[in-house]
């Protein structure tokens, strides 16, 4: 166990020295495994990990869902989702903020990435809120928080990777994320209402739109609704696997963007390059995490931790609560995927030994990552917005994001205390 603790310390030290966490995990895992196991088997293990990761059929779901999200973003559907939501509730106080949450939920049902959702909705939702006189802390906070729905509402990249690493059914993970995802969207809208109640001037009412315009706005989003229903309905119904669903989704998004005239040769090239770049980054993290996981598993840390918790006689739910607290702390200083992959080799065996459902734990991890994404000082969504909105002080983004941590934390506690919120839908799957 001492070797593993030194390994974790080494990763944190290298991270503080500004080394990318993928390289830090890979280097520490490789050197640590070489010292405790020997260099020849370590070299063989590293080569096998790279080969297995690069050629794993199940992992092809990752680039395909990324490609689907990029095609949909290129087609401009985020604007239409926002306009459709605004058409119905924009005339209320805080209506544009509520519309932003709904648009983020809709875009998240296609995108699967929190950062991409936040970046896209910043371009779509911030200008009209700024024009109407919304307070910067509310407009930036609701976009940053709404962006986190991109990883909660399926399809979700982080759910896919969790499912692959822990060998948990991805379709059941997607089904488990539906109710908590919708609940989080509702809680964020409650957060908007609370902010408007405390500070009515922060979110002025917009113009009321008539029913003909509302019907026209709904007609504009039929394509995205159909795509989501086909992909997720097929996965939930067992018609095809998550990988096949991702392929169908990417193909459908391609033809949809093509039909809308959004795909020139230059645009297609940019979509493919961006998808390849994101995929390469994720695969680098996966390879490094697998090497580090091999090192941790070779030490006695997972078994020692399980034995220690058993001897202490702590309530199982308290143990999971302590793990979630660790994730909250790590989420303020680390990127979400790296944080999850770094801790899963230690936490997951303990959770399964305590008899908890891995699908439920996967949803909890995504929920706690949501909180980390908008928690100062290193919440990734906040810095994405800061990079796009140079005119808005970072302090205002921090202020707004911190307020929306509360609704997301409430959602986390509800799923922790009432597991059926996550497990009810998967119970109907074969």
Regions found by a protein language model. Give the residues of each.
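Alpha-helical transmembrane segments of multi-pass membrane transport proteins
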Residues: 1-430
């Amino acid at each position: 166990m001492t070797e593993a603790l030194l390994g974790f310390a080494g990763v944190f030290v290298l991270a503080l020295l500004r080394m990318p966490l993928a390289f830090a995990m890979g280097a520490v895992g490789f050197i640590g495994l070489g010292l405790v196991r020997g260099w020849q088997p370590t070299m063989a293990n590293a080569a096998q990990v790279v080969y297995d990761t690069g050629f794993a059929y199940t992992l092809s779901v990752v680039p395909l869902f990324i490609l689907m999200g990029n095609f949909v973003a290129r087609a401009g559907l985020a604007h239409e989702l926002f306009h459709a939501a605004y058409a119905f509730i924009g005339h209320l106080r805080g209506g544009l903020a509520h519309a932003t949450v709904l648009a983020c939920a809709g875009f998240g049902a296609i995108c699967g990435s929190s950062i991409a959702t936040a970046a896209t909705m910043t371009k779509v939702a911030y200008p009209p809120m700024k024009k109407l006189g919304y307070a910067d802390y509310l407009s930036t906070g609701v976009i940053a928080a709404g962006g986190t729905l991109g990883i909660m509402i399926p399809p979700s990249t982080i759910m896919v990777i969790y499912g692959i690493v822990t060998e948990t059914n991805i379709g059941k993970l997607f089904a488990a994320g539906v109710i908590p995802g919708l609940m989080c969207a509702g809680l964020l809208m409650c957060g908007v209402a609370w902010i408007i109640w405390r500070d009515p001037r922060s979110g002025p009412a917009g113009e009321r739109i008539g029913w003909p315009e509302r019907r026209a706005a709904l007609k504009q989003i039929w394509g995205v609704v159909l795509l989501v229903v086909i992909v997720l309905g097929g996965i939930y119904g067992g018609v095809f696997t998550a990988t096949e669903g991702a392929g169908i989704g990417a193909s459908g998004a391609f033809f949809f963007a093509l039909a809308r005239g959004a795909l020139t040769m230059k645009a297609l090239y940019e979509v493919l390059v961006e998808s390849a770049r994101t995929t390469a980054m994720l695969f680098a993290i996966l390879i490094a995490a697998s090497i580090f996981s091999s090192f941790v598993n070779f030490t006695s840390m997972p078994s020692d931790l399980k034995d220690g918790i058993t001897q202490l006689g702590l309530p199982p739910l308290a143990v999971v609560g302590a793990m979630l607290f660790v994730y909250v702390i790590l989420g303020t200083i680390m990127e979400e995927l790296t944080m999850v992959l770094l801790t899963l080799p230690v936490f997951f065996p303990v959770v399964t030994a305590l008899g908890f459902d891995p699908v439920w734990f996967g949803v909890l991890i995504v929920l706690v990552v949501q909180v980390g994404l908008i928690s100062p000082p290193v919440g990734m969504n906040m810095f994405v917005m800061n990079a796009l909105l140079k005119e808005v002080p970072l302090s205002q983004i921090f202020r707004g994001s911190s307020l929306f941590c509360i609704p997301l934390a409430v959602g986390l506690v509800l799923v922790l205390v009432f597991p059926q919120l996550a497990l009810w839908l998967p119970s109907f799957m074969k």
